[in-house]
Amino acid sequence: MDDVKDKLKGFMKKVNLSSSSGKFKGQGRVLGSSSSSSAPPVNPIQNRFNSSQAPNPTPRPKPNPNPLPEKPLSSSDQKISGSTRNPDHDPVRAPQDGFDPYGAFITSSNRSQNGYSLSMFECPICKNPFTSEEEVSVHVESCLGDTNGDESSFEKDNNDNDKSEMEKLVVVYLSGKPSESSIDVLLRLFKNIVKEPENAKFRKVRMSNAKIKEAIGDVAGGVELLELVGFELKEENDEIWAVMDVPSEEQSILINKVVGYLEKRKTESSGSSAQVMEPVAPKKIDREIRVFFSVSENVASRIEVPDSFYSLSADEIKREADLRRKKIAESQLLIPRSYKEKQAKAARKRYKRSMIRVQFPDGVVLQGVFAPWEPTFALYEFVSSALKEPSLQFELLDPVLVKRRVIPHTPAPGQKPITLEDEELVPSALIRFRPIETDSLVFTGLRNELLEISEPLS
């Protein structure tokens, strides 16, 4: 019994000696914690056993100022935990030399008040925030383009100011409503200077000249335009002259701009005035109405007019002679029929008037004068106004005796109006009147006013 006690004492002594050795000496603590911590040692086996039994322990309401001891981590566990830990969630980490190995390459470096990153990326040029690096890369190119454009903004503003001043003066000049000839005089002056800048004759203008005075002196903004391009007003021999030195390259460019803007505004003003202007009423032609007694068709077809009706000017006579020479030369060649008809149509264009007679069923003949370019419905209106029954429908037959055809009243939809010249009713023609009678409307002849002025056809 005593031997057993002695052996037990020896075993306990060995256990105490091994626990107090240098290998296991010291107090267990969490890495990074203070060595002065006085927390009692924790048995890892007991801790593991307790954690397996209660994985979700209820936290105590009493706060513990000292950190709880944790299980020491091996070197491999430290590497894994260090690599998976987000550096942005570590409020203690702060770069000493300004370089953060865990930070984004392009970042706004702005932190929220809670201590975590906003995951925003900023442009290194304009400092605008973006949500991704791709958006920053796309934005940088446009941002660089904007900075290059800002460098030339001052020069662009100067050009715009010069242009606006030039435009204002041109508008003021045109608002004075100068005549077309006055604008042409000013344009001719500027164009001559650009074309021959060394010619002093174009660079010295006498303001008392009648055309210059009308085009520039009497129009608001005219003198200012001269001064804008480089002219100076001087007095010589009791007269005012606008004198200009040899224009520089910049002045030549400015003169060209003024010329172009003047021509542009001139075209716009003329176009707008043409749109605003009311459509011009067609020139009223004197029909020179005459009415003849009942005669036969052969007698009515003999139309005799005075020589003045066919009177031609000197230019028309010369043109007629040229046409005759061409006709003689072309008669010796084989010419297609279509070309001959085209030539005959061109020959009829020299007539300015056409005398047309309309023969009615009772033998009365109505005569009127028309222009070759008038449409055929003008002939129908003329005949309708002469009837006692203006609402009577009728047709006018072509003067061709072989096969009479109806002269069209109105053109087909989508076609241009047919003229008297197109129907070969120039320079004179005799056409027939054919009424379209109904039970209520019949042909009753011409109006009494026209019958009273009727005369025999000699």
From Swiss-Prot:
GO terms for cellular component: membrane; mitochondrion. Disruption phenotype: Enhanced resistance to powdery mildew with a reduced fungus reproduction. InterPro entries: PUB-like_dom_sf, PUB_domain, Ubiquitin-like_domsf, UBX_dom. Residues 181-248 form the PUB domain. It is found in: Membrane. Gene3D superfamilies: 1.20.58.2190, Phosphatidylinositol 3-kinase Catalytic Subunit, Chain A, domain 1. The gene is PUX2. Signal peptide: none annotated. Keywords: Membrane, Metal-binding, Ubl conjugation pathway, Zinc, Zinc-finger. Residues 1-103 are annotated as: Disordered. Facilitates the interaction of SYP31 and CDC48A, thereby regulating an CDC48A membrane-associated function. Appears to act as a negative regulator mediating the powdery mildew-plant interaction. Residues 349-433 form the UBX domain. The lineage of its organism: Eukaryota, Viridiplantae, Streptophyta, Embryophyta, Tracheophyta. It comes from the Eukaryota. GO terms for biological process: defense response to fungus; response to fungus. This is Plant UBX domain-containing protein 2. Interacts with CDC48A in vitro and co-fractionates with membrane-associated but not soluble CDC48A in vivo. Residues 56-70 have a biased composition (Pro residues). It is a peripheral membrane protein. PUB (PUG) domain is required for the interaction with CDC48A. PUB domain may serve as a protein-protein interaction domain implicated in the ubiquitin-proteasome pathway. It comes from Arabidopsis thaliana. A zinc finger (C2H2-type) spans 121-143. One of its GO terms (molecular function) is zinc ion binding.
